[in-house]
Each structure stands twice: as structure tokens, then as C-alpha cells.
Amino acid sequence: MGIRHELDILLVSENLALKNVELLKGDSYGCTINIKVNQQKKLDFIIILRPDWTEVRNVKKINMVCNGVVIDTTLIKKSFYEEVYSSSVTVFQNTTVEFFSDTSKKYKEEYPIVNINTIKRYYEIKDSRMTCINFESPISDYDQVNYLKDYINISDDYYLYDACDDCIISSDDDDDNDNADDDEEDDDEVNDIEDDYE
């Protein structure tokens, strides 16, 4: 069946979880996130990797790049079942954040692309590519209890709160009925985000 790691990315500062970010098959994992902001903003990430040990002896380090600048990721928890990393970056403008284990074009072209508008609290899977990526907002109680308490750089304000009742989440359902699925308001939101990254 092939290697199947599991990768989740928690954008803690937006109370948003990107779940099942891993490739459907292969010893590689990553994601591109386009983030729209209108002011200085601190972005706090928790990256959770659950390795598939059936065919690998070691897992590849998760690298992070923000607008072309390498950002450190800190390993905060490690066990046989998972590796948990944390990272923070302060941005002043629209930003592209990339997470990846491989720099090979072959793999990076299979990583999903996500748009996050922090102003309108709108989240969109622009291209799921070779993944089954999906969103969870707010971050689940399970993830908060198991991961946020280990992230020592995050204040208690992020812990066990529910501030995202008005979030809009969009994803491509691949049912060939996209015109029927999208209403006019959603199209406007998506266009606002995509205009900033083209």
C-alpha cells in the first residue's frame, strides 16, 4: 500500500486546524499556506507528524519558509507515535508560508495549497492535490488538550477557547457541481484572496 504518514498543522493564532495534510502515499509531507493580513500579526503554528514506520527507519525534518525566509521549527514533543513541532512568525503583509520535508519539485507539486484570510476569517482549500486535507475550526478539544498545553510560547488566551463561530470554510468537493455549490458571496471572498497571490 505504500508509506502513509499523517500530518496536521494547527494555526493556533487563528484557532484553525489543517487536518490530513499528508500525501495519500509517499515519504514526503508539506503544505503551502497563503495568508492575508491587514496589519502586523503573530502566527503561531503547531505541526504534528505521526510517522508510518512500516517502511522507514527515520522521519524527515519539517522545514518552514515564510516569504522565502527560513524559519526555525522547534521539536517540543517526541515519541514513537508522533513528533510535534512549534514555530512562530510575525508578519506585516500578505504572506506565503511553506512547510515541507523535501525540496524536490516532484514532491512539492503534490503538496496542497490553502488560502487563509485573517481579516474576513475565511479559509479555503485552493488545491488539495494529492491529499485529503480538510479544516477544523475551532481546534478540537482533543488537539487543544494534547498539543497546546505543550507549546510553552503560547499564552493561556489560546487554550480551550471557542472564538470562531463566524468563520467561513470552503473546500473543493470535486463533485463537478462547483457552479451550483458556490454562491456569489463565496466567489467574491475567494477572488479577494486569490488576487493577492497571483
From Swiss-Prot:
GO terms for biological process: viral process. InterPro entries: Poxvirus_C7/F8A. It holds the Pfam family Pox_C7_F8A. It comes from the Viruses. Residues 171-198 are annotated as: Disordered. Belongs to the poxviridae C7 protein family. Plays a role for multiplication of the virus in different cell types. This is Probable host range protein 2. It comes from Lumpy skin disease virus.
